């Protein structure tokens, strides 16, 4: 390039009006959930939005029956009573669905993120098509006790989660080894079967959402979720948003070689998944077919070696997640962690790393929350133009 030649500036990504509208709605909903009861004046201050925008969103929420106004008692005897806004818990409900190869877990959730009902359906050990699973979920949906919900028509959305790589915007499961699926359009199948709007998320990101809600961690608190069990995966929120990556593959780490160019056994999958641990234990004791068998054998040197290897690689990935994300909390979850929790506490670096709740409960709760947030945003969009 010559001295007189001017380098053209790189293009700047401009956020369109649709993005601004979505961001404003999400901001108002987050403040309502975290700070209620809250006045309109406080909403303007906390969101840094204009009074006009706040009024439009709030009026839409009131018209939809999702929030209500209440008078607060003034701190002093003089002065007008402030009008506060509160979330109406029974204004809307969502259903969460978690699909695994051997069972379906569902829940019903109100607008206060309270699980009011849950159910589990065992499955035969065989391959199920998406249509078959959607039909079974419809049966579970229709069999839920009607008296638990103020009005059955208030169930407005379904969140579906499964293990694997998913593309939420396309409603498609790109690949799920556990379910035996590849390029499956799951959202359309469930919507046609049950007749409600459907949102899709993978299991690790659903668990992250569910765990944060259960622990009262607000959206702006950076958090990472490390799943270890049927697979190995990571999900993280950064500045209030779930990290997804270029092709929605953020956190898919189980097949990444620990040493580049080395054989398959150097991937995290070989050292941290439940199936791999059981396979290694069975090579010493063929009667072992679950993790409990390995735990009962910890008085033997080979079992101690398997556990030591597991802890070494778990510590490695925890440090990697901490170094890359530097989150406020790292939550360990998955099917293996609760079973091995007593034996891994010595490798947890500090109080920021905690043991998660039940993996399936967190996942189905997160799926319901994803659907709840999605449908409320859609309902508001129908009511207003910002």
Predicted regions and their residues:
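Glycine/GP-enriched mid-protein hinge/lid loop-to-helix segment characteristic of carbohydrate kinases
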Residues: 118-120, 128-132, 182, 193-302, ...
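Short glycine-aspartate micro-motif
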Residues: 84, 94-98, 155-159, 223-227, ...
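Short, acidic, Ser/Thr-enriched surface-loop or helix-capping motifs
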Residues: 110, 168, 237
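ATP-binding/phosphotransfer module of carbohydrate and carboxylate kinases, centering on a glycine-rich
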Residues: 1-79, 84-122, 126-153, 260-386
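Short, acidic Gly/Pro/Ser/Thr-rich loop/turn segments
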Residues: 102-104, 165-167, 233
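Glycine-rich phosphate-binding loop and adjoining helix at the ATP-binding site
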Residues: 43, 115, 119-222, 338-348
């Amino acid at each position: 390039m010559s001295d007189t030649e001017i380098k053209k500036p790189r293009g700047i990504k401009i956020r369109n009006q649709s993005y601004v509208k979505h961001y404003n709605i999400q901001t108002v909903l987050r403040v309502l959930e975290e700070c209620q009861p809250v006045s309109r004046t406080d909403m303007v201050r906390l969101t840094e939005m204009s009074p006009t925008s706040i009024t439009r969103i709030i009026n839409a929420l009131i018209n939809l029956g999702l929030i209500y106004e209440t008078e607060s008692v003034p701190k002093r005897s003089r002065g007008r009573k402030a009008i506060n806004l509160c979330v109406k818990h029974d204004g809307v409900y969502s259903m969460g669905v978690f699909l695994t190869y051997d069972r379906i877990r569902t829940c019903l959730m109100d607008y206060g993120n309270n699980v009011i009902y849950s159910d589990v359906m065992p499955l035969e050990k065989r391959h199920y098509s998406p249509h078959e699973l959607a039909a079974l979920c419809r049966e579970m949906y229709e069999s839920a006790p009607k008296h638990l919900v103020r009005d059955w028509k208030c169930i407005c959305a379904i969140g579906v989660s499964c293990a694997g790589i998913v593309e939420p915007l396309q409603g498609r499961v790109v690949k799920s080894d556990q379910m035996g699926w590849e390029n499956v359009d799951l959202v359309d199948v469930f919507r046609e079967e049950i007749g409600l709007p459907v949102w899709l998320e993978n299991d690790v990101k659903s668990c992250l959402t569910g765990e944060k809600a259960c622990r009262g961690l607000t959206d702006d608190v950076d958090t990472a979720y490390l799943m270890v069990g049927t697979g190995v995966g990571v999900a993280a929120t950064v500045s209030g948003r779930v990290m997804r990556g270029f092709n929605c593959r953020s956190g898919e780490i189980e097949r990444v070689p620990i040493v580049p160019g080395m054989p398959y056994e150097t991937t995290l999958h070989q050292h941290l998944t439940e199936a791999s641990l059981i396979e290694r234990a069975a090579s010493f004791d063929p009667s072992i077919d679950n993790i409990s068998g390995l735990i009962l054998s910890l008085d033997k040197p080979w079992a101690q070696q398997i556990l030591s290897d597991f802890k070494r690689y778990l510590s490695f990935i925890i440090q990697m997640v901490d170094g890359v994300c530097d989150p406020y909390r790292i939550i360990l979850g998955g099917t293996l962690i609760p079973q091995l929790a007593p034996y891994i506490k010595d490798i947890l670096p500090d109080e920021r790393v905690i043991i998660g709740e039940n993996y399936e409960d967190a996942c189905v709760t997160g799926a319901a929350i994803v659907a709840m947030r999605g449908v409320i945003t859609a309902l508001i969009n129908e009511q207003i133009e910002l």
